[in-house]
Amino acid sequence: MTWAKVAHNAGNGTDHVDCDSCNAYTGDTACTTALPVLCYKSDGSPVPAGLTPDFYNGWQPGHISLTLPVQGTLLTSLAAANQICVNSFGTGYGIASFSHSLGGWSWWSYGDVSSSQRFWTYISSTSGNCWN
């Protein structure tokens, strides 16, 4: 399953990442496609002033980054996907999830990732991952 960056708030350094017409149930991109992995590291960051999280636009308290593009076929499990993030950014990073503490589909976090292409994410409740 892939997501996209839909907004950046330069005032507080946050990105809004979103399903943006993804298929959360069966995936939306051929696993032979090479795309960056959206990686996330939780650090307990408070919600920035002016941002009001809700079910569809949550807050992930941490930072996001993108790996170099990898074929989805390398995402053979959640552990394999997490390891790609660790190898790229260090301990504590893992592949970003569809869900957040209030719900899913879309969330904000600190970062400024590229908006030029979609990126791999994962979902725990359906078969939308390349390893399913």
Spans of features found by a protein language model:
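Secreted/extracellular ectodomain signature
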Residues: M1-N132
